[in-house]
Amino acid sequence: MARRTEQRRAAVWALYQSDLLGRPLGDTLPRDVHMFTLALAEQAREHQPELDELIRRHAKDWPLERIAPLERSILRVALLEMLHPDVVPGDQPIPPEGAIDEAIETAKRFCGSGAPAFINGILGAVLQERTGAGP
């Protein structure tokens, strides 16, 4: 079984490919996709209008369309886990700070050098807005 980090990254890649290629989400997932990955990707797509509105609001001076597609996908998955832990399968949802850490690590590995700080800033602002706490 793949680790949760790998499953999150698989969901991010599926969303990224779907956005970039304009293909249905189901076409970007392997047949033997893990239930956790499938739920993350599908729920991020289902909640996308809400998640994108949060990204728009907190990405000051950055229209959503200017944010790199991979960074948008990372943000969507992290925001989903932060705001809707009930829609993701599993006994123990990741705490919001953990979702932020996972997103930052994914950005460090796969995005440009400025992406981790950008992602941290947006996710931290959402956390602050929702709970009064920051990372």
Role assignments for model-derived ranges:
Residues 1-135:
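N-terminal interaction/assembly modules
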